[in-house]
Amino acid sequence: MPTDNDLKTSIVELLHDLDALLVAHFYQKDEIVELAHHTGDSLELAKIASQSDKNLIVFCGVHFMGESVKALAFEKQVIMPKLSCCSMARMIDSHYYDRSVHLLKECGVKEFYPITYINSNAEVKAKVAKDGGVVCTSRNASKIFNHALKQNKKIFFLPDKCLGENLALENGLKSAILGVNSPEEIKNADVVCYNGFCSVHQLFKLEDIEFYRQKYPDILIAVHPECEPSVVSNADFSGSTSQIIEFVEKLSPNQKVAIGTESHLVNRLKAKRHHQNTFILSSTLAFCPTMNETTLKDLFEVLKAYKNHRAYNAVELKDEVAHWAKLALTKMMELS
């Protein structure tokens, strides 16, 4: 049985032999992040991987991320050690999108501007593009939202209700959730949100903020905008994973901070701050199971198979889906 160090050595050699680019999301296991040529959030990795001069992209993340790279750079080979799926992305597909549009019309909404969070599959992104909409990430969501407001239409934000509600609150707008609020409330809302959510960021509660502020009156709270509105509105800072990292790394060593995002990222930030004055904003383990499925063995096996011409877990998209999804993604990049 090979040791972790043996696997790491073999992975580095295979990446070199295959002339491959290895990218990993911040929420991946530490040993995967350690080997990656680049780490980042969804937007950063999509840009880096699609613009790389490497023809083989090895993506350690969840499936929609690999799809985004494939859509942006259709000619590249994109493989994933695990075809893990984001739970939020699984909450909507092209059928549910069509059904949601039908429900909007039943509520009297004749025109709308769709924004899909990047945590959605390529088919949903393609549908949004066909309806004139765009993709956003947590990093550029405010810019994309401001662009959408200029279209003078009701905004349909999917699939994350929390991010949609937080953007509405940020702009002083009225929001409603499709399937939760009444048809009248849907019709009168400025922003209609699909009823999806992140299972990890739902774990952070206002009570957690109150607990830490009572214990440490000078503590700062930094959270991801996928958290509930009550959490985001009471935090000192809200931003994407990259923005949270930037925020925390600028703090003085003596400044206490509680962070509301996935535990692997928080633990890395703790380590950088010598495990002092850094806390995770939850009494439960804020762990993303699908983001952490990929192991060193998985990475080694997928690379070895590719070298032996037995490739598997390749990300494949239909031509039309890739075309329309790329339009939505490139539009996002142009606007951000």
Curated annotation (Swiss-Prot):
Binds 1 [4Fe-4S] cluster per subunit. Its cofactor is [4Fe-4S] cluster. Gene3D superfamilies: NadA-like. Keywords: 4Fe-4S, Cytoplasm, Iron, Iron-sulfur, Metal-binding, Pyridine nucleotide biosynthesis, Transferase. InterPro entries: NadA (IPR003473), NadA_sf (IPR036094), Quinolinate_synth_A_type3 (IPR023515). It is an enzyme of class 2 (transferase). The keyword 4Fe-4S applies. It catalyses: iminosuccinate + dihydroxyacetone phosphate = quinolinate + phosphate + 2 H2O + H(+). Its EC number is 2.5.1.72. Iminosuccinate binds at H25, S42, Y117, I118, N119, S138, H224, P225, E226, T241. GO terms for biological process: 'de novo' NAD biosynthetic process from L-aspartate. This is Quinolinate synthase. The lineage of its organism: Bacteria, Pseudomonadati, Campylobacterota, Epsilonproteobacteria, Campylobacterales.
